[in-house]
């Protein structure tokens, strides 16, 4: 029992494999679990256990994803691997699997390929903060110069999308040989694990971030004032602290005069908890669902942003027809829908169901947002797409 208890105190980090089809992402995932289990204990996962990825739903979209876990001496990792390219696109855009860092798998025999580029671009757009490169299938390349050339190409590609290409760790390995138990190549998996530990910083926990609560409901309690309810997304709210009410209308200031959960009064509400927050001097009609309560100065309302979106295919319950510029759907942020207009990239006339695309959105009301905020695209309450704010514009 004591061992189990000790494990839970390790920092938890979310990672995943990305890269071109058939470059060895799933084989590498299996090799990491196998070599680390052999070295540090834990469960090994075979290739076919990972390859048969179960379906899951995120924001109404079906995604095939495999989740594995492994440990190094200092950390616990949760790792996602997707079987198909479309699953990666959907996963990264919906944030179904938030990554603190990604392992980009590039076959040394091929070098960077179209999906290599697309996954790096997606990583940039959706805010994957760190990329480590695993140059796979190096056992099949005898030419040192060729390996150096591929490495240089990968570094240039990373730099092109604003990742620090020159400083990115690159491990030369063979996932298959490591999986087969070849000691020389197993050492490369341990080298990769070392970079996961050293290159990806420990993620900041939700509770340590500035307070934010998306408002789900508003009540008036006679003699006490106005209460808003919702789940604390991040941070802590304490009785007596100032808050801002952000989004839809002009930003207002108030003070939290009480926090309650399950009808009990508390001193504070913490990330992950469903709470009611009593606000001083705010009338019931001055506040609504879709706004957020936040620590003053930490989040601003915006109407215009660049986004990366995935449009559901017909089979996924999405649109049956393409849309064109001038399309005006609803954008669902946190707890509410806001109508918006879109601008498509230069040279793109229409967007087909099943496409992923970069678009600029202008909302009719401002919403509290930062880069990285996820949203759904809806038509009359039906989800037709998912997106992420890549860059706030105004």
From Swiss-Prot:
The modification Phosphothreonine is found at residue 383. GO terms for biological process: response to antibiotic; translational elongation. Changing residue 376 to T/V: Kirromycin resistant. Its main location: cytoplasm. The N-terminus is blocked. Methylated in vivo on Lys-57 in response to nutrient starvation. It is found in: Cytoplasm; Cell inner membrane. Changing residue 334 to C: Pulvomycin resistant. One of its GO terms (cellular component) is plasma membrane. The modification N6-methyllysine is found at residue 57. Changing residue 231 to C: Pulvomycin resistant. Residues 174-176 are annotated as: G5. Coiled coil: none annotated. Its EC number is 3.6.5.3. GDP binds at residues 22, 24-27, 136, 139, 174-176. Residues 81-84 are annotated as: G3. Residues 60-64 are annotated as: G2. Keywords: Acetylation, Antibiotic resistance, Cell inner membrane, Cell membrane, Cytoplasm, Elongation factor, GTP-binding, Hydrolase, Magnesium, Membrane, Metal-binding, Methylation, Nucleotide-binding, Phosphoprotein, Protein biosynthesis, RNA-binding. The modification N6,N6-dimethyllysine is found at residue 57. The modification N6-acetyllysine is found at residue 314. PANTHER family: ELONGATION FACTOR TU, MITOCHONDRIAL, ELONGATION FACTOR TU-RELATED. This is Elongation factor Tu 1. It comes from Escherichia coli (strain K12). The gene is tufA.
